[in-house]
């Protein structure tokens, strides 16, 4: 890797890109002694030094022009947080035990998103290992970790990271993260990592001070000037993030990446950074392993999800489908505030369209966005290009009180929606604790210094003031302060709940549906074509149909009304799942209220 500290037979080589600097010194500390080494200026803004006796464990920082001292932006580990020196790490020290593991094909994907700090009481990489067997038994095939990039303080969602190569020390060491991934592979679980390539966090990002070339002031984002993917001197910046992706996939053996909010990556060059990154992954670790790239993209840009003639992804494997969440949420809760307004008129139609065609908005005007056209046509894409879900960290945690959908939805309608998500061809995603209807909230939490903490708290309350429910300042004041330790502690799962009968009913539903998916649906998904179709009747009954790889037809009929109904579309074939016993009335099938039936008809 051209960035950071690299060990070799000659010692440790340190590199820093700082185009505007005249002088850079390397400050080293090991075994109680300190020293400084003058770094050599190279071409294109690089400074470099090789030190023979700087083994793993050595602390180091860079002093720029005799003043500002900064950690390594490509630090592999910062044990004392983001403002302190970095540590030399030997990436070959860990002895892997997953020889022969090459990942799993995408059609197997059942994803479980978790926050390492809130997943277990200890909140560590090592503690998470204890739950891997449970996840595999549930039917999960991939664990997705919320961002790990080093952030300021002891707790954070991860989207305020400033050292993107360094797993945050609050969760454990680099080798302990490798142990977690190694253990997951032993359970046949893939591991994905959420990465943030659209901004750096507000506290601990020194790049603005000494390498402003990392940013392009011509483009603006909610975090300030955009990362410089297309301005002057962008090549080093692009390489920084491409190497970051390769680093996680190769050095840590992650099986895929989820790229956060790529709609805020501004890049007018060609090929853009997403295309170049995907190509680098495909030609690198993806050449011999199953590697999956998943996007979060509010713009619904289908062109990133295209397939070649063999139905292999050209760029990204899939995208989180926020539309299916929003539509299903309106169906089961009736909430229509904020972005849910886009689905309020025909929620079941949008839900069915997402199941069959991918995006709910494929170029139509979005009322929530001022009737601006949103999205691109997606009907030509296969269902595996879209990740479906009813809960994520965003959709739970961005509520004022972090309530999970189980606390606000009609339980019968929610069970029906769960079956639709888990048994439709698109890969499903669960958010930690969803499977047993966890009662704990997932609140927004962070650990900033006093000035920034106050700004975050006030900003969050101001954000919710736009909703009629929070017009009263007194009610705004009840919104939890994200900077308190209590906000973090309340967000931790209480695993004893999973054994309670009421919670176990939910996990049994998930286990049953995922078992059916594994046995009957996943084996028929490889190379599946874009064949989905749907109908909606009176915004109460929903039908969807897909042609699978072997020519068989997967069929869904769902009644989301409060009364039983006779479906117009009759299902023929083997019943894979029925939420209620199949009933006939005068020779015609009857769908009870809030019920779902999946059938499989042979070719």
Spans of model-derived segments:
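The feature marks proteins involved in alpha-glucan
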Residues: 1-9, 13, 34-113, 120-123, ...
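Short, well-ordered beta-strand segments enriched in hydrophobic/aromatic residues
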Residues: 14-16, 553-560
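Short proline/glycine-enriched turn/loop motifs at strand-loop junctions of beta-rich domains
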Residues: 17-23, 561-563, 571
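C-terminal beta-strand-rich structural cap/linker in extracellular carbohydrate-active enzymes
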Residues: 18, 56-58, 586-603
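Core domains of carbohydrate- and sulfate-ester-processing enzymes
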Residues: 64-99, 187, 205-222, 338-369, ...
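Substrate-binding/active-site clefts of carbohydrate-active enzymes
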Residues: 79, 99-106, 115-292, 303-304, ...
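Conserved alpha/beta catalytic core and glycan-binding cleft of carbohydrate-active enzymes
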Residues: 82, 274, 278-472
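Glycan-recognition and catalytic regions of carbohydrate-active enzymes
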Residues: 360-374, 430-445, 470-554
């Amino acid at each position: 890797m051209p960035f950071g500290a690299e060990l070799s037979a000659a010692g440790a080589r340190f590199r820093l890109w700082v185009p505007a600097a005249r002088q850079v010194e390397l400050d080293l500390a090991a075994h109680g002694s300190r020293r400084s080494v003058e770094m050599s200026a190279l071409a294109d803004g690089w400074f470099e030094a090789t030190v023979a006796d700087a083994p793993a464990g050595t602390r180091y920082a860079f002093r720029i022009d005799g003043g500002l001292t900064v950690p390594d932006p490509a630090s592999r580990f910062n044990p004392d947080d983001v403002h302190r020196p970095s540590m030399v790490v030997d990436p070959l020290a860990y002895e892997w035990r997953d020889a022969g593991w090459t990942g799993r094909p995408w059609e197997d994907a059942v994803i479980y998103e978790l926050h390492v700090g809130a997943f277990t009481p200890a909140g560590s990489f090592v503690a998470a290992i204890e739950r891997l067997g449970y996840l595999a038994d549930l039917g999960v095939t991939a664990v997705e970790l919320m961002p790990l990039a080093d952030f300021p303080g002891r707790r954070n969602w991860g989207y305020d990271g400033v050292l993107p190569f360094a797993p945050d020390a609050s969760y454990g060491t680099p080798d302990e993260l490798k142990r977690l991934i190694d253990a997951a592979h032993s359970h046949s679980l893939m591991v994905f990592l959420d990465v943030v390539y659209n901004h750096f966090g507000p506290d601990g990002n020194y790049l603005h001070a000494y390498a402003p070339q990392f940013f392009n002031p011509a483009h603006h984002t909610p975090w300030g000037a955009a990362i410089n993917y297309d301005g002057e001197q962008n090549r080093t910046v692009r390489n920084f993030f491409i190497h970051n992706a390769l680093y996680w996939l190769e050095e840590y053996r992650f099986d895929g990446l989820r790229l956060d909010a790529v709609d805020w990556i501004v890049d007018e060059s060609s090929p853009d950074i997403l295309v170049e990154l995907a190509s680098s992954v495909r030609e690198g670790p993806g050449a011999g392993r199953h590697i999956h790239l998943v996007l979060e993209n509010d713009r619904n840009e289908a062109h990133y999800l295209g397939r070649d003639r063999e139905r292999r992804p050209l760029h990204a494997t899939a995208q989180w489908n926020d539309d299916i969440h929003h539509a299903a949420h309106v169906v089961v809760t009736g909430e229509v505030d904020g972005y849910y307004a886009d689905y309020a008129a025909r929620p079941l139609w949008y839900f069915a369209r997402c199941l069959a065609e991918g995006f709910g908005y494929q170029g139509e005007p979005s009322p929530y966005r001022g009737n601006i056209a949103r999205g691109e046509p997606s009907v030509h894409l296969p269902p595996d290009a879209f990740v479906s879900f009813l809960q994520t960290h965003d959709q739970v945690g961005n509520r004022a009180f972090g309530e999970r959908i189980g606390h606000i939805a009609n339980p019968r309608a929610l069970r029906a929606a769960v079956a639709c998500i888990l048994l439709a061809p698109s890969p499903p995603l669960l958010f930690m604790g969803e499977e047993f209807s966890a009662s704990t909230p997932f609140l927004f939490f962070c650990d900033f210094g006093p000035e920034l903490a106050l700004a975050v708290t006030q900003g969050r309350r101001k954000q919710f003031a736009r909703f009629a429910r929070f017009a009263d300042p007194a009610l705004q004041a009840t919104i939890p302060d994200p900077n308190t330790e209590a906000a973090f502690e309340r967000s931790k799962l209480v695993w004893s709940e999973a054994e309670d009968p009421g919670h176990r009913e939910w996990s049994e539903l998930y286990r049953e549906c995922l078992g059916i998916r594994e046995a009957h649906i996943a084996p028929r998904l490889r190379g599946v074509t874009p064949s989905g179709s749907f109908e909606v009747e009176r915004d109460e009954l929903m039908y969807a149909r897909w042609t699978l790889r072997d020519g068989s037809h997967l069929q869904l009929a769902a009644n989301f009304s409060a009364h039983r109904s006779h479906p117009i579309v009759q299902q023929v074939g083997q019943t894979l799942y029925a939420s209620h016993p199949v009933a006939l009335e005068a020779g015609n099938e009857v769908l009870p209220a809030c019920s779902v039936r999946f059938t499989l008809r042979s070719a």
